[in-house]
Amino acid sequence: MNDLPEPTRASVAGNIERWTKANREYGDAHAQRQWLAEHITWGQFGVREVDIGSPLGAVAGLDILEAGCGVAYLSAWLARRGARPVGLDPTPAQLATARRTQTETGIEFPLVEGIGESLPFPDAAFDMVVSEYGASLWADPYAWIPECARVL
């Protein structure tokens, strides 16, 4: 992360601080319920997928990166539908909650500590990148969008 511009480093540090607090106040207590929900909700308005149809289409057999996974409920949902997700997040507390929830639910997939602005994956590593409430809202779009394109 030291090779990133100072504004990006400061933004990442602020996001980690905010999401550590959010995890303590909400995410940690609700992770298992979110992981096991039959239908996911999208974005800050909580739009139910069942009401809008799946914006992702068929995901079985796809390698999917969730950029800014938080407690990784979307990655869990993808795994339950036969995808091979990888959850990426910069916040250790949220990843710890996700790992605990993996143990509780038996739903396994890789969880990686990292940032959308500098993805730790090789070129063309994924079939799809999703960001339900993560990188798309909190990361520098001039950095994370090209990074996501690179790994597709």
Descriptions of predicted regions:
Residues 117-128:
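A short acidic, Gly/Pro-enriched loop at the edge of an enzyme's catalytic core
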Residues 32-62:
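Conserved alpha-helix/loop element of class I SAM-dependent methyltransferases that forms part
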Residues 142-152:
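A short glycine-rich, Lys/Arg-flanked "PGG" loop and its adjoining helix->strand segment in the class I
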Residues 1-34:
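N-terminal, positively charged/glycine-rich alpha-helical extensions of SAM-dependent methyltransferases
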Residues 128-142:
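A short SAM/SAH-binding and catalytic strip from SAM-dependent methyltransferases
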Residues 58-59, 123, 145:
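A short, aliphatic-rich alpha-helical micro-motif
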Residues 28-29, 48, 116:
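Class I (Rossmann-like) S-adenosyl-L-methionine-dependent methyltransferase catalytic domain
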